[in-house]
């Protein structure tokens, strides 16, 4: 099971083994100045993703999207599991990017080698063309969101939301809170699924505590039968 980013058992709850906050280690400036340090923790995330598989929650969301063509998925996850589970790419917004493939920070070459093989080599991984440092297409701390993903989110926000299902996030960023506020302002339904209460809980019409893999398949099956 992959750890959450914040909250109970979260990856970003403390300092790293190197004595710096994870937000510093996994930042754009650190990747530029100390690529080996940044890649130490990128590799930990990468290896955890490679060991894991999409769970029942991912498949339940994908099935719901197939049944309801107007349903969009906004995810902060960078593991690519929603694609693997079958969520339609045209209605999937990966706002923080995806771990693979890597590209060269110097020449821009896209590296198609498997991520697993690159993580087995000395870090940071290097470009086969120019020996520059490779990086994933993910949003590190202190970096801008990808323009295309942000534009798609803004377009859907302008259209509005009848209902928002918030799963496994503390919604620490304004762009994650935006759909929740939009739904609330228009009288829409907000349902939260999380291991523990969060700052979102007072905004939700219904808060369900539990693992997404356990809750989502039952919840969406119940909604589908109505």
Summary of predicted features, one role per range:
Residues 1-226:
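Conserved catalytic core of sirtuin-type NAD+-dependent deacylases
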């Amino acid at each position: 099971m992959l750890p959450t980013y914040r909250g109970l058992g979260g990856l970003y709850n403390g300092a790293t083994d190197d004595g710096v906050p994870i937000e510093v280690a996994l930042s754009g400036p650190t990747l530029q100045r100390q690529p080996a340090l940044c890649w130490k923790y990128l590799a930990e995330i990468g290896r955890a993703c490679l060991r894991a598989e999409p769970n029942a929650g991912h498949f339940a969301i994908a099935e719901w999207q197939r049944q309801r063509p107007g349903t969009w998925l906004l995810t902060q996850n960078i593991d690519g599991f929603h694609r693997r589970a079958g969520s339609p790419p045209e209605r999937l917004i990966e706002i923080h990017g995806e771990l693979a493939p890597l590209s060269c920070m110097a020449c821009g070459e896209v590296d198609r080698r498997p991520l697993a093989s690159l993580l087995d080599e000395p870090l940071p991984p290097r470009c086969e063309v120019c020996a520059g440092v490779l990086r994933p297409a993910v949003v590190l701390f202190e970096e801008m969101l990808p323009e295309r993903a942000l534009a798609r989110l803004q377009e859907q926000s302008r259209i509005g939301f009848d209902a928002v299902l918030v799963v496994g996030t503390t919604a620490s960023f304004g762009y994650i809170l935006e759909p929740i506020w939009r739904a609330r302002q228009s009288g829409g339904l907000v349902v939260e699924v999380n291991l523990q209460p969060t700052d979102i809980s007072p905004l939700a019409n219904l808060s369900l505590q539990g693992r997404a893999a356990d809750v989502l398949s039952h919840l969406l099956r119940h909604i589908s039968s109505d």
